[in-house]
Structures are given as C-alpha cells and as structure tokens.
C-alpha cells in the first residue's frame, strides 16, 4: 500500500466517502484535499470545511488517526506486546476492583471504565490469534476461553448480589485471564511471540469464492477461500487475513471506535469492478526457520473446553500423544486427521513412524529418578500392566499427556467421615483415554490421583451446598464425588465420561479388578499439614517417597501391593535401595531397625479406609467431640478446685484470678443464676438474698450498689 502522504485529492475523496453513509452529503471532491493535508486534519480545519457535526468530525478524525497508526502498528504490534497489554490491563483492573465493590451498591464508574479497557485489550489479542498461523498451524484454542471469562465478568458487574461474592468472582476471573497470559509468554516460542504482520497485495479476477467475515467493530477478515479462486491467488490468501484495502480504498477501522467501512460499503466496493479486484491484506507470514529452543506446550489452568494444549496440527503417528510446536522449514504443514476440514496449503509431510516402546523386565517398577525420553507416550507407559506401580502411573504431567479428551476445573469431595466432615477441594482434572487424572495446578509434574473410569459407573449426586454434582461409583471400592461450577461444565464432563465408559468398559463376565487397578490417590488431609511437607511440583525423589503424602496401598502398611517386593528390585542399586527403604517403612521400623509408629496422616487415612460407613464415622466423630468437651470441662474444674482450695485466698488474690479467668468466671455465674432460678420456682424462702453454700465467691465491690457490704469472712470459702 502506498503511503498516505502520496494520495491524490481524488483518492482522498473516495476514501472519505467510504467511511459512512452519513457523510455522503459533503462535497469531498471540491475540497481538493491531498494525502499530506488529510493527515493534518483537526477539528478547526473541519469546521472551516463546514463539517460542524461532532459525530461526523469523530468519524473523519478517527479514520485519519487509524491511517496514521497503521504503519506504526506494523512495526510494534506482535503477540508479545498484545499479551503484555492484556496482562497489564488485567492487573490494573484487579487493583481497582479490590476494596471498591464493597463500598457501593452499584458498580463504580472507574471499575466499568477499567473493564472496558480490559475488553479492548482482549479483543486485540483474540483478533491477532485468529490469523492463520495461530488458528490453523498452531492450536491456540485454549486462549479462546478469555472471551468466555470476560463475558462472565460483564454479567457479574451488571448483576446485583453480595459485594464480597461479586469481588471474589471478579478477582477469580482476572486471575484466570492473567494465568493464560503468563502461559502464552512463557510457553510460546520466541519466533511466534515476535512475529509481526505485513501488508501484501493480491490481484483477483473475481471476488467469487471469497468469504469475508465482518466483526461488530467493522473489521473484515477472510474466513474461507473456495476452489473458485485461482490457485495462485488462493495460495496468497489465507483464512484470518484482514482486509485493509479494496481497489486502493482503505477499509480498516480505528482500533477502538467503529470508524472503518461498514460491511455493505465493503461489499459494494468488492462488486464495483468484478473484472479486476485488488486487495491489500494484513497477514502474519509463516516463519521459514524452525525454532532454536526445544518446543513446549501451553498449559491453560482455566480451560473449560476439551482442547487445551498449544500444539501444531501436523500429522503424527497414532501412538504419538506428546504435542509441541513444530515450525518446520515447510511453511504449510498439512492438517492432522482431526482437522481435515480446515484449509490445507502446501504439500503434506510424511508421518513419522512410531518408536517401539522400551521393554522392561517383568516386575520392575519404573524408576522415578531416571530420565525419560520425551518422545515416549505417557499413555503407552501407563498401559504396561504389571510393570509400573501406582505411584509411577501418577508421575505424569499435563504436558506429557498431550491433547486431552476433556479437561477443566472440578470440585472433588473428600471421602465422608473425616474429622472435620466432608469438604470440597478444587482440582484440575484431565480425562485421557480411560483414565481421569487430577492435579493441584495444570503445571504440576505429578498427578494427585487417577481413576480408571472404565471400572466405574456414572451416577448423579446430591449435596446440600453444591448444585451440579455427579459421582463415579464402584460396587466394591469407594466412590468419587465431583461438583461442576456451571451447567455447561456438568454437561461437558457427563458427555465425555459416558463416552469413555461405554468405549472402555470391560465385559460383564470379566473378573473384578483389584483396587490398585481402579484408582490411586494422594490422601493429604489438611492444607496446613500439606504446606510443610509438600510442594506444588515435587521432585522425582520426593514423589517416590511415602513420606510425601502418598498413602496408596503401595505406600501404606494396611494394604501392601505384591509388586513392591525385594526380589523384583535387584536390577539396579538405586531401585534396590529405594525398595529396601520402602519395605522398612511399610514394616513399621526405622532405618536402624527400631519400631516406628505410623505418621498421623497415615493413621488417619487408614482409619478412613477401614470405616467406610458414614453413620459409623459420624458416631465416632460424636464420641471424639464429647471426649474433647469432657477433657476441657475437667481442666476447668481443676482450675476451680485450685482457687477454692487455696488456704491463703484473699479478695485481692481472687480479683486477680477473676481477671485471668474471666470467661470461666462468667460461665460459673451464669450456671449459678440458672440454678438459683430453678430452685426459687420450687422452694419459697423468705430471704431471697441468701446465697447457696456451694456458689462461687463473688467480688464484694462488684455488688456494692445492689446490697450492703458484708464482712470479709462471708466471702471466704467454707473451709477457711
């Protein structure tokens, strides 16, 4: 596109007429305004040209501003700058929201203005991610959740509700958006982050076969290129390209105001000269060189849709489950079988043959300390029955799982009957094949637990405080109860779980599976207990030790797995040493051979496993509560006995004791008053001020305004 400074007066007049239908009454041709003067327009110059309507002035000045910024944005705009802009707007919005929503009945104006700024930054990033490089060659579908999060944010700000709940929801949404931005900046290759857009001119004989989508902000994108478009031009036009100029008429819009050409004007210009069509497209070129750093996968901690990982859509072997960036020298890799309906530009690369899996000796558990090849599928390792312990099956990260069948945040309820009653924990769940994993965060290197869904049945659940509850039940082993945040999440999970169960469920005549084949989990009871000994991403050495929260049957003395025997761990010194330490701990002895009791966490988890009856657990909890109450009352009674049995008790000494035990003294007076009221209703006495001989001593100064002072001897206990 030629510089605006070189535009002729005729071209300037044509561009001004294309801005809006309301500007058609102005004599733009009579102005004889060259391109250089167009860029210098201001409100005073428009007043001199008889453009007095403020709305018309805004339309023209906004378009001029867009022309000025078009070339400058090409040099500065990229994925990194747009992501950092959204991240900064999110942090600014968080700082404004904190403490502001609780003071006003309605949402303050400054909060709404900050929300509008946040929406503008999000729109700019999402429009950038709609380009062909990001929407077809790399999977950034996880980032589309930003749109859903901001729609939820808009609803929350306009709804009436408790201020604390509204502020908590807003901050949660902002943290989700910030997490997605951080993952883009950290996990995306440098080539994609710094890739800038370019302007490219394309000549077409006819606009037939070209589908253009217009957004609500009058921004025009190519959505589809049919076979009617000539081959040479079809290779130059890609889905996601933005239409900047049609037949030398700029149709772009200003970044934040609707000053671009409306769709009907754009279509009219396309059809004005069908014999020859010239387009200038703003597009992101496909890099020719591969990335220099090892590729990584984008993990979104707030994704609700089944597609999460940031991965290329190049063909792969059926057993290949590890996705990564692959910007090969071929600028147009072919689509994967899952994306056969998308546009394919260029030859399709040959699929990579899968590598044969490594064969381990029978009975040897996977060593947590040994490095693993990144091209091995974790699902393939997991399917090697009898070769891996339950702990090693959970030593797999979201990144290693690759593209999941379904993932998202769910609430997991503890097994009923805990000491503090049932509680819910928010976890990130990933359904891959027939296995359901859950993590504290999507970045964790080890799953907290896993369930073989094919051995369970899906049923609806009930809870007084949760609305969208469902559960996986088993005829023999304990159930797992979940709760979704919304009805959409519930429908998504139920649909995928039903598909998984029907696909992988064993026939009815199959023998019942063992407990270790059904589930494996880390049963950490309290977050406070976990904070001292656990981390969000434990190292392999920590993950292999039962002292770090793994209370699965392979790590508890109440239920031992036959796979962790000393005879099977003699292939290497490291495995043998690990097996010996695990065996000593399972046997209840220390490294020196001395008896060692169970840890509190192991004892509590084994108690919950032995008592699965909720009624029995509630009775036990009731007994323990009564025992604690009895213990506290005995301590209070001992304190009272000490003060009543003191032979040197004086008024001053008693007042000091009362200050130190004010709560106990108040309870004693209250109990004494109740006893007096009950006694007076049955026994009528003439002296209503006479005190019971067993009552607590009272401070003489405290009741001096109610009755005459008595002698000091009457305030002493009977034995003084």
From Swiss-Prot:
The modification Phosphoserine is found at residues 307, 314. PROSITE patterns: CRIC (PS51290), PDZ (PS50106), PH_DOMAIN (PS50003), SAM_DOMAIN (PS50105). SUPFAM superfamilies: PH domain-like, SAM/Pointed domain. It holds the Pfam family PH. Its main location: cytoplasm. Residues 7-70 form the SAM domain. Residues 78-164 form the CRIC domain. Residues 304-317, 533-546 have a biased composition (Low complexity). Phosphorylated on tyrosine. Residues 196-285 form the PDZ domain. Changing residue 493 to A: No interaction with Rho. Residues 348-359 have a biased composition (Pro residues). One of its GO terms (biological process) is cell surface receptor protein tyrosine kinase signaling pathway. Residues 403-502 form the PH domain. GO terms for cellular component: cell cortex; cell-cell junction; plasma membrane. May function as an adapter protein or regulator of Ras signaling pathways. This is Connector enhancer of kinase suppressor of ras 1. It comes from Homo sapiens.
């Amino acid at each position: 596109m030629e510089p605006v400074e070189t535009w002729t007066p005729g071209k300037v007049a044509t561009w001004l007429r294309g801005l809006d239908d309301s500007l058609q009454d102005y004599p733009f041709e009579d102005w004889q305004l060259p391109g250089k003067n167009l860029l210098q327009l201001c409100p005073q110059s428009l007043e001199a040209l008889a453009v007095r309507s403020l709305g018309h002035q805004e339309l023209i000045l906004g378009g001029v501003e867009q022309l000025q910024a078009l070339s400058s944005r090409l040099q500065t705009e990229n994925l990194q700058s747009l992501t950092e802009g959204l991240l900064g707007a999110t942090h600014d919005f968080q700082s404004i929201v904190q403490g502001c929503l609780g003071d006003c009945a309605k949402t303050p104006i400054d909060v709404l203005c900050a929300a509008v700024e946040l929406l503008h930054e999000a729109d700019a990033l999402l429009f950038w991610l709609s380009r062909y490089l990001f929407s077809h060659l790399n999977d950034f579908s996880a980032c589309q959740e930003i749109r859903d999060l901001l729609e939820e944010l808009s609803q929350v700000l306009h709804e009436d509700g408790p201020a604390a709940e509204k502020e908590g929801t807003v901050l949660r949404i902002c943290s989700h958006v910030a997490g997605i931005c951080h993952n883009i900046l950290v996990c995306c290759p440098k080539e994609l982050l710094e890739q800038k857009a370019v302007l490219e001119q394309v000549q077409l004989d006819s606009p037939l076969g070209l589908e253009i989508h217009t957004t609500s902000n009058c921004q025009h994108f190519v959505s589809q290129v049919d076979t009617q478009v000539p081959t040479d031009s079809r290779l130059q036009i890609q889905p996601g390209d933005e239409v900047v100029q049609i037949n030398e008429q700029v149709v772009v819009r200003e970044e934040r105001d609707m000053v671009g050409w409306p769709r009907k004007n754009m279509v009219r210009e396309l059809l004005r000269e069908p014999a020859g069509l010239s387009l200038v497209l703003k597009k992101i070129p496909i890099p020719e060189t591969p990335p220099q750093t090892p590729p990584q996968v984008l993990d979104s901690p707030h994704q609700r849709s089944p597609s999460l990982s940031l991965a290329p859509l190049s063909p792969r072997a059926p057993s290949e489950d590890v996705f990564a960036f692959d910007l090969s020298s071929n600028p147009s890799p072919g689509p994967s079988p899952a994306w056969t309906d998308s546009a394919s530009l260029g030859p399709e690369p040959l699929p990579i043959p899968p590598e044969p899996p490594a064969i381990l000796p029978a009975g040897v558990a996977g060593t947590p300390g040994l490095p693993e090849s990144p091209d091995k599928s974790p699902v393939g390792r997991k399917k090697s029955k009898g070769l891996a312990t339950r702990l090693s099956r959970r030593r797999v990260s979201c990144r290693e799982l690759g593209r999941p069948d379904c993932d998202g945040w769910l609430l997991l309820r503890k097994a009923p009957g805990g000491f503090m009653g049932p509680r819910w924990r928010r976890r990130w769940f990933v359904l891959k094949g027939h296995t359901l994993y859950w993590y504290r965060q999507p970045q964790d290197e080890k799953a907290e637990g896993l369930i073989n869904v094919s051995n369970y049945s899906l049923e609806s659940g009930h809870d007084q405080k949760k609305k969208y509850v469902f559960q996986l039940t088993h005829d023999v082993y304990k159930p797992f109860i979940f709760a979704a945040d919304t009805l959409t999440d519930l429908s998504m999970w139920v649909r995928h779980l039903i598909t998984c169960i029907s696909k992988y469920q064993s026939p009815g005549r199959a023998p019942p599976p063992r407990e270790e084949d059904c589930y494996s989990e880390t049963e950490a009871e309290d977050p406070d207990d976990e904070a001292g000994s656990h981390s969000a991403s434990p190292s392999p050495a920590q993950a292999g030790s039962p002292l770090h929260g793994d209370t699965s049957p392979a790590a508890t003395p109440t239920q031992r797995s036959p796979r962790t025997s000393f005879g099977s761990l003699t292939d290497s010194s490291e495995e043998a040493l690990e097996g010996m330490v695990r065996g000593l701990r399972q046997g209840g002895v220390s490294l020196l051979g001395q008896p060692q009791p169970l840890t509190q966490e192991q004892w509590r988890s084994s108690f919950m496993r032995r008592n699965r009856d909720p009624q029995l657990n509630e009775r036990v909890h009731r007994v323990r509560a009564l025992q604690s109450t009895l213990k506290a009352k005995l301590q209070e009674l001992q304190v009272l006995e000490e003060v009543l049995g003191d032979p040197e008790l004086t008024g001053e000494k008693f007042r000091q004791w009362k200050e130190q035990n004010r709560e106990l003294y108040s309870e004693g007076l209250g109990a004494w008053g109740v006893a007096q009221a009950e006694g007076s209703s049955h026994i009528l006495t003439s002296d209503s001020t006479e005190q019971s001989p067993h009552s607590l001593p009272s401070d003489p100064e405290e009741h001096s305004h109610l009755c005459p002072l008595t002698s000091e001897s009457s305030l002493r206990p009977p034995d003084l």
